[in-house]
């Protein structure tokens, strides 16, 4: 936060929400885990929202004959606070992978690891538009160029983030900023 920012800007910044994520990575003793390299789950009784299968993206992502699953379990300080540890989610993820039929009872779990990502995705809630206008207006008034997912406070693909950074650099280097 910028020291001395006006109270309305500080309050607006506090209204901007993002998700946090626990990534659970599982190694399994077979590679035919899914026909899709990524899939989504919107069931409230399943702990993960998205699954990726990294072994399908490159033969170097898992040993021959094995498969890998990366499960994403989402939280947010504003709506669903994270408590406990990332490791607390390993067994619930494996349980739900079995419930979905992606991991069978006779599959051998070769590896399991969990990690916590403090900043995952921008949340597009009803507070976002007005709060963003206030924060961006303040930064514009100070001549501060913002960029990327958390500067623009939007969802961006890698190429869009690069372009956002390029535009911010051009703005920062333009003669009008001097």
Segments (PLM) and residue ranges:
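C-terminal helical "tail/cap" subdomain of flavin- and related membrane-associated enzymes
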Residues: 87, 91, 101, 112, ...
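Active-site-proximal substrate-binding core of FAD-dependent oxidoreductases
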Residues: 107-118, 171-178
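FAD-binding beta-loop-beta segment adjacent to the flavin cofactor pocket
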Residues: 53, 57-64, 105, 116-153
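Short glycine-/acidic-enriched loop or helix-start segments at secondary-structure transitions
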Residues: 1-3, 124, 156-157
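Mid-domain catalytic core of redox enzymes
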Residues: 1-83, 87-88, 92-101
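A conserved FAD-binding loop/helix module that cradles the flavin
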Residues: 139, 146-176
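Alpha-helical elements of Rossmann-like donor-binding domains used by nucleotide-donor carbohydrate transfer enzymes
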Residues: 88, 92, 96, 130, ...
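A short, local hydrophobic-aromatic micro-motif
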Residues: 49, 110-111, 142
